[in-house]
Amino acid sequence: MRTRIDHIRIPIAAVAAIAVALVAVALGCGSSGDNTATAQPTTSARTTNPAPVHGPYSPTIDPANFVSGVDNRYLPYKPGTTLVYKGVAENGTTPQADVEFVTHKTKRILGVDATVVLDKVSSRGAPIERTYDWYAQDRQGNVWYFGEDASEFKHGHYVKASDSWEAGVDGAPPGIVMEAHPKQGDAYRQEYYPGHALDKGKVLGTAGPIKVPFRIFGTTLSTVETSGLEPGAAEKKYYAAGVGNVLERVVKGNHERFALVSVSP
């Protein structure tokens, strides 16, 4: 899952708990701004937070409350779509590419048919990580993350399975990766598998303009992600309506950065 702060592309060996200066990295024709405003995304309705970050966490998953496919405004996953991102690894210099492909496959987890998204990270053509992520959307419009099957590679060769988990296995519940109606200040659990994954997300508000190689976005939704396993790390992400994630960069911990280059078809 590209939203993992405790599993950012190349696993972080050690994270300094201090803020690092944001770096402007040449990405073909793109760069970006970082003007997070206080304005909030327009909402037509509000629902109770299904993945609260405080207190016991044991969400009730009713398969009847889930729909087929994922068409959330800020995180749509239409089968057949390919999103290509380019950027740099945690050292701020090593080039990396990330290709997300929304497959036509589903995986049944806890009775819910989750959309399978294949995420492949590489550097100079050599594979680094391959992950199958599982997403599903409830009838309220929230996008849930049901886990991942991740593999790591070194020098182009398979090394090991990495931080894989599945909702319902070993007590791990699913989490939220995008709310139906995100509001500034909202916080939610993305992953809750103690000892393996403890990611949280928080809505910062609207941001813009954001310029990436794919295009310029006048308005985006800005979030920040942190992890209980990496207390000194934080990553900002920017989402565009109808497209999804367009820019992400680590703002505490290292210099990793990725920006959207293309979307097809």
Predicted regions and their residues:
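Core hydrophobic alpha-helical transmembrane segments of single-pass membrane proteins
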Residues: V15-V23
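Conserved functional acidic sites
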Residues: S44-P265
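Bacterial N-terminal signal peptides that target proteins for export
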Residues: T3-A16
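Bacterial lipoprotein signal-peptidase II cleavage site
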Residues: C29-A39
